[in-house]
C-alpha cells in the first residue's frame, strides 16, 4: 500500500476513541528520552528507533526537558511490581500503586500514559512494558520501533489492533509506508499540534496527498 492508501475515513479511525470522540495530538516540544531496565545494547536500539521516527516526523530531540528533565520515559520490567521500586516514580504518577494493581489484574504486557500542554500537544509520555513471552519473542529492533511509533502521536486505543504499524520489506521490518506518510503529515508545521474535530483527518489526508 502506498502513502496515498489511507482514506480520510481510515485516518479518522486511527484517532477515534472507544467513546466515539476524535483526539489527535503530536509532541509540542523536543523529545528528551530516558529508558529504564535494559542493557546498553538494547538501549542503543531503542534510541536508534526513536531517532529514526523523530527524523521521519521532522521533529526534534533534546538531552533534557527544561521542565521535566526527561519527558519520554520507557520502563522495561519482568513483573509489574518492579515499578513500585523505581525511585520517585510515585511522584510522577500519584496513583502508581493503583496502576500496578490494575496492570496485574488485567495481565497487561504494555501500557502508555500521555500528558499534555495547554495547547493540547503531547508534553510527556510514559511507556511501561512487561517482558512476557510474547514481548521477548519480538526482536529488539522490532519491539523498539513499534513502541516509538505508538508514542510519536496520540493514536486511538484500537489504532493498530487489527493491523500493526510495521511490515516486512526485503527481509527487514519497516514502518508501513502509509503510516510513515501520516506521521510526516501530522508534524507539518501548518497543522495544529492537537485537534478534537474529525475534520482534522481531511487536513492530514490533504497533506499526505500534497507530499506525493
Predicted regions: what they are:
Residues 1-9, 94-102, 208-212:
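Short N-terminal segments
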Residues 1-74, 78-82:
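Long alpha-helical, hydrophobic tracts
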Residues 8, 33, 94, 165, ...:
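Proline-rich intrinsically disordered, low-complexity coils
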Residues 18, 78, 114-117, 190, ...:
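Generic signature of intrinsically disordered, low-complexity segments enriched in small/polar residues
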Residues 120, 124-212:
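Glycine-rich, aromatic-bearing surface loops/beta-hairpins
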Residues 41-46, 60-146:
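Long, folded non-catalytic interaction modules
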Residues 48-57, 82-96, 180-194:
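Short, Lys/Arg-enriched charge-dense amphipathic segments
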Amino acid at each position: 500500500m502506498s502513502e496515498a492508501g489511507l482514506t480520510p475515513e481510515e485516518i479518522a479511525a486511527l484517532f477515534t476513541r472507544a467513546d466515539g470522540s476524535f483526539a489527535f495530538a503530536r509532541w509540542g516540544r523536543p523529545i528528551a528520552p530516558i529508558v529504564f531496565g535494559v542493557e546498553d545494547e538494547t538501549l542503543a536500539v531503542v534510541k536508534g528507533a526513536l531517532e529514526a521516527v523523530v527524523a521521519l516526523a521532522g521533529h526534534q530531540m533534546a538531552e533534557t526537558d527544561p521542565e521535566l528533565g526527561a519527558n519520554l520515559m520507557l520502563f522495561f520490567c519482568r513483573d509489574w511490581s518492579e515499578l513500585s521500586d523505581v525511585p520517585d516514580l510515585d511522584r510522577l504518577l500519584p496513583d502508581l500503586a493503583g496502576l500496578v494493581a490494575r496492570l496485574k489484574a488485567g495481565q497487561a504486557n504494555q501500557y502508555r500514559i500521555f500528558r499534555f500542554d495547554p495547547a493540547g500537544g503531547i508534553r510527556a509520555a510514559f511507556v511501561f512494558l512487561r517482558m512476557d513471552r510474547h514481548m521477548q519473542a519480538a526482536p529488539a529492533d522490532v519491539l523498539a520501533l513499534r513502541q516509538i511509533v505508538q508514542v510519536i502521536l496520540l493514536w486511538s486505543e484500537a489504532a493498530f489492533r487489527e493491523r500493526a504499524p510495521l511490515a516486512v520489506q526485503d527481509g527487514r521490518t519497516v514502518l508501513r509506508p502509509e503510516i510513515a506518510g501520516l506521521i510526516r503529515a501530522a508534524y507539518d508545521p501548518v497543522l495544529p499540534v492537537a485537534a478534537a474535530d474529525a475534520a482534522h483527518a481531511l487536513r492530514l489526508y490533504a497533506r499526505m496527498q500534497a507530499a506525493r
